């Protein structure tokens, strides 16, 4: 059984990175709330705490706002899984 690295996003580290990048650009949570058109800022706070991740569309927009590529926002981690385990996740 072959073992391969399976990339996984670290939500807590990614959230901390979103917070850092936002602050580095001099933006507030309210600025992001307004940019995304959210009625409340809770989604931004959840991203920053790692309780949820932005959708792909929101991640793409966030990268434009922060002026960084999407892969500089996401903090990965790796888990080693077998091909069979990966196939079960991807193809079920």
PLM-predicted stretches and their roles:
Residues 26-46:
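Short alpha-helical DNA-recognition segment
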Residues 2-8, 64, 74-92:
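Short, charged recognition helix plus adjacent turn
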Residues 16, 27, 39, 54-57:
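Residue-level signal for the short linker/turn that defines the boundary of a DNA-recognition helix
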Residues 57-72:
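DNA major-groove recognition helix of helix-turn-helix/homeodomain DNA-binding modules
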Residues 47-48, 58, 77:
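DNA major-groove recognition helix of helix-turn-helix
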Residues 1-24:
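A short, Lys/Arg-rich alpha-helix, primarily the initiator
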Residues 19, 30, 60:
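Residues within the helices of the helix-turn-helix
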Residues 22, 33, 63:
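The alpha-helix within a helix-turn-helix
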């Amino acid at each position: 059984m072959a073992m391969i690295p399976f990339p996984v996003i670290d939500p807590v580290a990614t959230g901390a990175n979103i917070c850092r990048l936002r602050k580095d650009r001099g933006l507030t949570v309210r600025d992001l709330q307004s940019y995304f058109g959210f009625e409340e800022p809770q989604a931004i706070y959840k991203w920053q705490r790692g309780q949820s991740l932005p959708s792909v569309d929101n991640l793409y927009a966030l990268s434009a706002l922060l002026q960084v590529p999407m892969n500089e926002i996401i903090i990965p981690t790796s888990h080693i899984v077998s091909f069979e385990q990966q196939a079960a996740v991807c193809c079920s």
